[in-house]
Amino acid sequence: MEVRSRAYLAGALLPGQRATSIKLALLASVCAPALFGAISLAASSPAVAACTGPGAPNNTQTKCVTAVQIPGNPLRSFDISFVSPDRDEYYLGDRSNKGVDVINTNSLAFVRTIIGGSAACSGCKFVGIVLNTKTGAVDNNHSGPDGVASHGRWLYAGDGDSTLKVIDLNIAGPNAIVQSVSTGGSTRLDEMALTSDGKLLLGANNAEDPPFATLFTANGDDATSHVSKITKITVDPTIIPPGFGLSIEQPAWDPKTKRFYTSIPIIANNPPGCNYGQLSGAITCDGGLLVTDPTTLSTPTAVQGAFDPTTNTGVVKLHACGPNGATVGPHDNLLLGCTPGNNPSDTTTLVINAKTKNYANIANITGSDEVWFNKGDNRYYLGASKAIGGAVLGVVDGTSVLIETIPQSANSHSVAADSERNRIFVPQVAPVAVVGIGGDTTAVGAGICGTSNGCVAVYEHKVDHDEDEHGDDRRAER
């Protein structure tokens, strides 16, 4: 197996120039069995025989160290993850247990599942799993929680009823929701991103037709919650035509350009005459990247069109990429999780510079949903659930080189990393025999978890900080 495309995008490429792929030897294979034993998670949690099998190889740089067990229902459906290194906490939108799971990133102990409202939001609760009445599968468009993001004491979670749930993490126990704000839609509020100061939040209603994003005021470092809607953002219908189930996906905030960058899986006429769903047969249109300046949006609604280089706003056309995930890495580079789940011809992952729009394709890794840049080791981590050959955790360094891939349970699409300890958290679904449609159809997850209930796998990349060069931007809010 080979990896390709080392590309220092900042300054190395001329405007519009595409990086040339170069072959590099794979740094580590991923087929050896694990040699790691069980690790006790907490005094109240029994040790389990975790980190075995294909998902825990002993010859990779990224090592499986334990599996955190989630009390309650086996994990059938979950969505986005987030880490707050300042609070030493990991958060997971856990639909199976109708809440947001919290794990301590230092002790690796399960802390709680936040499920309901405080006195300030009596009756507030998450939707949980909603099933498709015809197929029995999870209805992703109406289930929740979905996307999560945090700043300081405030955790924000999108829900299946098109609401933004605001959680005060300083409130102990399971009932910490203090506010619920509707986007006005009828389907889930999905992935989201915060500005670095935590005062603005952009969330995507990916399942609406046409899809839209909402810009909210957020709480920053304030002591009380006052979240409200500012603007509903749609994309010009010539770019995202209504009536075909097209979507927008993961936003990311770049503090240098002061823009939100939101992945768009499929856009019309990219290239001209392509199929975005208006024709029979496979999708052939590539995706786009929506660039949003929150200071110039009209209210209460705004429509964004084609990319305008003079304002650095609008939809950038992508090549050979229909992305889901988006994350900001070093030098204002964004890694986009291209996936054959959007365009069957996708075989790579894309890195694009936020300023120049120069780009490079990374070979031998595709199919990502959530992607995350970890400043602690200057690496991207990819939840590649639609990877060719089966779900993997992808590891790409800050110069756009694929380091390794590690097998994961089927549908393992969520990932977040703790930059303080370089621990990577990857939730695993329970086996299909336990939870039904949507469960793990391989034995990989059970080997990682040590149980048949699913878990949150914890990987670690040990770094010599005296020699490591980090990216120059702190991994920020999504």
PLM segments and residue spans:
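Intrinsically disordered, low-complexity segments enriched in glycine/proline and serine/threonine
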Residues: 5, 20, 26, 438, ...
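Predominantly soluble domains enriched in secretory-pathway, periplasmic, or organellar proteins
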Residues: 45-478
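Bacterial N-terminal signal peptides
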Residues: 15-16, 23-43
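Exposed boundary/loop context
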Residues: 4, 9-11, 30, 42, ...
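N-terminal secretory signal peptides that target proteins for export/translocation
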Residues: 1-22
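A detector of low-complexity, intrinsically disordered, Ser/Thr/Gly/Pro/Ala-rich segments
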Residues: 18-20, 37, 181, 193
